[in-house]
A protein has these predicted regions:
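Internal alpha/beta loop-helix hairpins
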Residues: 1-63
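Non-catalytic connector elements of ABC transporters
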Residues: 40, 49-169
Length: 169
């Protein structure tokens, strides 16, 4: 990506997206592009409603996220009831600490059980299993700290609202 001005992402002869490297990384058009270009957590959801350029998306684990709707994207005309996915890059997730009771879940947060902690130098990768029927896993990258959770802890994380991106399944 460092040597390209524009990239075409294709799968089985079908063009999924054409654009600048940063655009494709930050705003993938499809779940395939999100997974193919860098690491991404792609979570299935259903649009519950829309208010202007923001859509409320309910994930399988019950979490409600609000995602910006880009009128120029393939999902620019997304409507309530539509099945979509959201792309969350590992670096766009913030660790909030121990998760409160499920009934106290704040909008825009995800809860998961820590399955992996990997020190990579200046950062740590943390793997989570979300509490949904699909066994969805999530990967996040945070700056190294002495205050890390332990494997088995149930934690809350919050995606940066500006970096929640809807993609076509």
């Amino acid at each position: 990506m460092a040597m390209s001005d524009r990239i075409a992402v294709m799968n089985a002869g079908v063009l999924h997206q054409l654009g600048a490297p940063r655009e494709i990384y930050r705003r993938p058009a499809t779940a395939f592009v999100a997974r193919f270009i860098g690491r991404s957590n792609v979570l299935d959801g259903v649009v519950e409603g829309r208010d202007g350029d923001v859509a409320a998306v309910r994930l399988a684990d019950g979490a409600l996220l609000r995602a910006r709707v880009d009128a120029d994207s393939t999902l620019g005309d997304v409507t309530a009831g539509q099945e979509i996915a959201v792309s969350l890059r590992p670096e766009s997730l913030a660790l909030l600490g121990a998760a409160p009771a499920a009934s106290d879940r704040a909008e825009g947060t995800l809860h998961g059980t820590v399955t992996l902690i990997e020190f990579t130098g200046s950062h740590c990768m943390i793997g989570l299993d979300l509490a949904d029927e699909h066994g969805t896993s999530l990967l996040m990258t945070i700056p190294d700290t002495d205050d890390l959770p332990r494997v088995g802890d149930v934690v809350a994380v919050r995606p940066d609202p500006a970096k929640i991106w809807m993609v076509a399944r």
